[in-house]
């Protein structure tokens, strides 16, 4: 089976690849940028589900176009195997902030027109934007959401070309990690809002996700929960 990750986010790709390393079946995992030129995908949906769907459709359509053209044999052979395209959209939701950052998690500082020029990268700007919003209400309950959209092409379809998108079924999986956000950053691991989020599960020391090592984080994360459902479904189908 070939799995194509519909993401150009290196942090997410690394997490997905680590989670898929111990899959019992033989699986080849590619970031879509290993097969295609990366391109901008408009994430203008109103929910994590809509954004994940936009991503999986965009990457599938690009792969479909590639499958119709003359290409190298090693690329053509990918389409002769069971093929899964996995897209994910995720974010942090804080109920006291009306669910924000939510679907704007990756661009929260920009969404809030927060002065971000003084920060070294987008993650840092987003963190300080959230800290600013939490000034009078942290610690407070919060949760991470990961939504996965899956397109799976069965082996008998895979004859060097792919079927049109209209013939594909998109399936959905969601994982949630409950916890709370605090008003100080702790830890140097992970990415995104990990330094502010304390998960409620398997965390007797009240560590932030940024204080977990990757292997420990990947046993409880929202992304792991959604991906586990997706992988179980893939092996049911294959």
Curated annotation (Swiss-Prot):
Location of the active site: 89 (proton acceptor)
Binding site for substrate: 7-12, 90, 191-194, 217, 222-223
Keyword terms of this UniProt record: Hydrolase, Magnesium, Metal-binding, Nucleotide metabolism, Nucleotide-binding
EC code(s) of this entry: 3.6.1.66
Cofactor mode of binding and number, as noted: Binds 1 Mg(2+) ion per subunit.
Positions annotated to bind Mg(2+): 89
Presence of keyword Oxidoreductase: no
Gene3D superfamilies: 3.90.950.10
Known catalytic reactions: XTP + H2O = XMP + diphosphate + H(+); dITP + H2O = dIMP + diphosphate + H(+); ITP + H2O = IMP + diphosphate + H(+)
Family: Belongs to the HAM1 NTPase family.
Assembly description: Homodimer.
Protein's name according to its UniProt entry: dITP/XTP pyrophosphatase
